Amino acid sequence: MTDAEFNAAIERMIQGDRSGLRDVYDAYGNTIYRLFLGLVHRHQDAEDLTSEFFLKLWGCASTYRAGTGHKCWMNAIARNMAVDFQRKNREIPMEDAAEVYAEQQTSAETAEDEVIGAMHTNQILSRLSEDDREIVQLHLSAELTFREIASILKRPLGTVAWKYRTAIGKLQKLAEEGQLV
């Protein structure tokens, strides 16, 4: 979705037209879900947060300033929601593979593949510090640029790019040593 399309969708939302929200959801629903899944590590919580996110987006559409980067704005909202969620739920247990598989039994094979892929990705990323993992997830899952990530995290651009390269280097080294399955 381009900035112009997003701006038009926001304008429709402000006027009470749900089609604007539907367009934003269609364009970013999966991306926001993957971002939450990477941050909270539980499928049910990620789904709940995704629903809450779009309700919140509907309510705060009028606060968006055109030209400020809609992806950055949405990801800042999502990240803040995940941080608030984690504060309220300090103890966040990881789901085991059997539970995840059982939850996804009714879904199509592609959904099962997506769950397994997400579990594998989370397992791999768990080898990184929380700080590095967040940067990698924002860049790869949320498809944000380093500049957008720096803005969200309120860190220098060079630091974000360096931490990303260092994290990817660590993962490559672990893969070469056969420590990543």
Q: What spans do the regions from the language model cover?
A:
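Short helix-capping/turn signature of helix-turn-helix
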Residues: 27-30, 38-41, 137-144, 154
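Residue-level preference for hydrophobic side chains embedded in well-ordered alpha helices
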Residues: 24, 28, 32, 53, ...
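Arg/Lys-rich amphipathic alpha helix in sigma70-family domain 2
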Residues: 62-66, 76-96
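Sigma70-family region 2
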Residues: 14-15, 41, 52-69, 88-89
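Structural recognition of an alpha-helix C-terminal capping motif at a helix-to-coil junction
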Residues: 34, 48-55, 59, 68-80
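N-terminal module of bacterial RNA polymerase sigma factors
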Residues: 1-31, 38, 126, 180-181
